[in-house]
């Protein structure tokens, strides 16, 4: 967006005597008190030189965090506790990528007020869009970092503060708190966009290092166009780790952030410290490094090598190992934070992003050649940071380490299988695209450098993009471009939805009194068989709960309510036919038995979730749910299929909560209060876009924001029976349950099945198990006998088939046309002949009704002379379709059973021609 330069002209700049200048390198404009300054003081326009400046020295990350918070508290800002690194309160973002994310979209859109105004927060963030550059840029890029934010929300009728005050705060903080000379602080004009919002900004740069960004969020981005926001937001981001680095006399941000932990990692990984002149030379030159430009990276190594008196190869090798060390420091902290906040690695959503970081760390570890478990490094991080700002790392340490070890084990197996797929692909294609590389990584876990290595052995050149992992992360929503899946969508025609939006909100009698069975209301509108009332007892599909059914009486006639949906706050009833009137009084009655079973199942799901968390761990979150009158399902995040003992324990705990007769409290409270009282666990079934939340609390057992109908006490559930547990996908486990009266129905169905089994095996129910066990043993013995007989028959057939051998230029061709009761015998004969006669080809002709199946196998010597895939290719014109390997093919011919002998002869002819063409071995 092109802006008028006046947007950046502030009274503060005029008062202090700042000059607006244009950077000689990048061409961007900046404000400075130094009349001789020619650069914007930002990377990659200048080398880093901040170590040379007067400044407060020796701030740790903890010191920098404390100093930032205390400064803004003194200036009237209320401190707000940070949120998790997993953005549970948002449906359009997986990770917390900035401090403002904590207040989007509910606060920035005006749905709810901010928790304080103005406020200060230090928010742990995870951002993966620059993951490929971590380590290389010696600290400019990190995947996890702390963002210090002071935010002000300016309403049309109330301005807190805007540009002038924001810039003054920044100037005072950096000059007074950090002791930076005033003429060294540069304000670079910029533009910021993110999370659907945008606005002009200043980047605060000192000595080549960007220390903060001051954004004035005043536009929303809609279809590529900028619309003014009702609420103008001061969105600042101060780099806490960068401030610590800036204050210390150390070459890299990793020295400043990790301190003694860096030395510990260095020993564990066997990475020797580079020569001092090399490391400091690299640190200074990194300011001019543009990691996205391969030529810039090459120049960087040249400059560093020259300054250190080394060859480029030596410099690249030493700095490569150092960058790997920094990468592992960064990634292991990020892994600990992600898992500490309950992410379960998987192939989708935030779970995929966690797996990406884990696997990149594992690959880095292997390339270093370090003989150490990744879990050992992650544990060091958890203990280092858990005592500081992240207590969850210690309380969830067992889960974190178990998952890391499990992921490492899975990755080794995945990699082994994946490399085989790479070899297959490279034999088919002589050039691999970026999409091919991403598919190989996504589907088979093979990193691009390993693909390139395997390709080079086959003479195939593979260009690996410098930002490969960032591309993969972006594809899977690391930048927030991918929305979480929202369960409920209106299932009405578009014209009905538009029509419904024109009505006032429907009064929800199903919430006011979920035990009511009949009601009266006023008819507001009719379109076809769709009806809208001013109030209703009919629950619309939502929160994973199916809608109510029942009867509506309109204008003296009764209509069946078949379906109920919600469009915004308006409830739409779908009737069995179009009503004869469009206004008047309505009377309704819900199908109570159906409703009550739904209520029991919905509360049962909440109880089950509480039990699953207690047994499996605090990382368990709802990944999906459905409540029907007959049964309910709950999908949870978990890294493996629970054991039988764990499932029984979950069921026992859930039923103990029912026996405890816990009261179910339901209240509507404002969002900020709900989050303060109960945390973000309330967002299990989605994130309502409302200022007030309907909170369903089952004592201390479970609390959630929920739209559904519930029983008043857990005792009303009666009982819960888990009827099925399965792994839905990697990282997600599905529980299916029945509750209340459905438990008795389920038990009755099991009894019916048991009676059926008993009648089949003979005897009563009590003897059924023993009789089935006996039958199972008899079946095993019968299978053993069949196997022995099959082997005996195969030996007999081998002798018989050998007598019919046809020799073609040194290759023996055997044809089996016997009709056998078991197709496995053909394959066993073929296998025996191939082993005993390596220079043979065996053809098995198998009739399947009117169709023909042909199995053709070659011994090791014969396979070198004839590629059976060439046989398959020639036979395709004769109606035989199929394929396979050079030594074995399977062909199928529809309607060819009657011509079996003729087809077999044609196959022999094709083989003969190929053998003759190949010549003798």
Swiss-Prot record:
CC cofactor note: Binds 1 zinc ion per subunit.
Domain of life: Archaea
Residues at which Zn(2+) binds: 602, 606, 706, 710
Entry GO CC: cytoplasm
Subcellular location: Cytoplasm
UniProt xrefs under PROSITE patterns: AA_TRNA_LIGASE_II_ALA (PS50860)
A single GO BP: alanyl-tRNA aminoacylation
Substrates-to-products reaction catalysed: tRNA(Ala) + L-alanine + ATP = L-alanyl-tRNA(Ala) + AMP + diphosphate
Keyword terms of this UniProt record: Aminoacyl-tRNA synthetase, ATP-binding, Cytoplasm, Ligase, Metal-binding, Nucleotide-binding, Protein biosynthesis, RNA-binding, tRNA-binding, Zinc
Cofactor(s) the protein needs: Zn(2+)
UniProt enzyme class: ligase
Major localisation: cytoplasm
InterPro entries noted in UniProt: aa-tRNA-synth_II/BPL/LPL, Ala-tRNA-lgiase_IIc, Ala-tRNA-ligase_IIc_anticod-bd, Ala-tRNA-synth_IIc_core, Ala-tRNA-synth_IIc_N, Ala-tRNA_lgiase_arc, Ala-tRNA_ligase, Thr/Ala-tRNA-synth_IIc_edit
CDD domains per UniProt: AlaRS_core
GO molecular function terms listed in the Swiss-Prot or TrEMBL record: alanine-tRNA ligase activity; aminoacyl-tRNA deacylase activity; ATP binding; tRNA binding; zinc ion binding
EC number: 6.1.1.7
KW RNA-binding (keyword) present: yes
Entry comment, domain topic: Consists of three domains; the N-terminal catalytic domain, the editing domain and the C-terminal C-Ala domain. The editing domain removes incorrectly charged amino acids, while the C-Ala domain, along with tRNA(Ala), serves as a bridge to cooperatively bring together the editing and aminoacylation centers thus stimulating deacylation of misacylated tRNAs.
Function, in words: Catalyzes the attachment of alanine to tRNA(Ala) in a two-step reaction: alanine is first activated by ATP to form Ala-AMP and then transferred to the acceptor end of tRNA(Ala). Also edits incorrectly charged Ser-tRNA(Ala) and Gly-tRNA(Ala) via its editing domain.
Recorded family membership: Belongs to the class-II aminoacyl-tRNA synthetase family.
Designated name of the protein: Alanine--tRNA ligase
Record organism: Hyperthermus butylicus (strain DSM 5456 / JCM 9403 / PLM1-5)
Gene expressing this chain: alaS
